[in-house]
Amino acid sequence: MDKVTLKKNLQEKMDKALKVLDHELKGLRTGRASVNLLDSVTVEAYGDRMPLSQVASLTTPDARTINVQVWDKSMVSSVEKAITVANLGLTPSSDGQLIRLPIPALTEERRKELAKLAHKYGEDTKISLRNIRRDGNEELKKMEKDNIIAKDEHHSLAEQVQKLTDEYSSKVDSAIKQKEQEIMTV
């Protein structure tokens, strides 16, 4: 592996770690309605388990409601059951075709729990970034040992790897700070 490939590889891995964090943060319920809350819901449909988004259209008509328009009327009850079983704290109400999910206001205690969880996701992502950095530094040592790069070049590249790690770590911090503000806003 050459140094350009190594840097590109590290950057791709760090981007993936950030995408995972972003996905986890989107799943955290804030005071606002978001169709991302239902990403984890799977429905028993046609003899298989399918994501809710493949059997219904999801919309947010206002900040406190999610509407689930089920395409096949015979599946409305199984969609309601799947939402209830998902344990999201949402109570579906249906008129036979459209399912409405009112989003209850978050209590102060629940907001703090969610902020803590967001912080934990951030820490887990930082651990992933540090592991990626460690792997990169080990690869640099191997490259130096195999005489692919010189010792001074090894130190220069190690500094670049650290700089890259710091850059991504600050992106994690800002994402967590933004999510915590979003959660704590009443």
UniProtKB/Swiss-Prot annotation:
SUPFAM superfamilies: Ribosome recycling factor, RRF
GO biological process, one term: cytoplasmic translational termination
GO cellular component: cytosol
Keyword annotations of the record: Cytoplasm, Protein biosynthesis
InterPro entries registered for this protein in UniProt: Ribosome_recyc_fac (IPR002661), Ribosome_recyc_fac_dom (IPR023584), RRF_sf (IPR036191)
Subcellular location(s) per record: Cytoplasm
Keyword Cytoplasm: yes
Pfam families the UniProt entry points to: RRF
CDD domains: RRF
GO molecular function terms noted in the UniProt entry: ribosomal large subunit binding
The protein's role, per its UniProt record: Responsible for the release of ribosomes from messenger RNA at the termination of protein biosynthesis. May increase the efficiency of translation by recycling ribosomes from one round of translation to another.
PANTHER family, A to Z: MITOCHONDRIAL RIBOSOME RECYCLING FACTOR PSEUDO 1, RIBOSOME RECYCLING FACTOR
NCBIfam families named among the record's database cross-references: frr
Similarity field: Belongs to the RRF family.
Protein name, UniProt field: Ribosome-recycling factor
Taxonomic source organism: Rickettsia bellii (strain OSU 85-389)
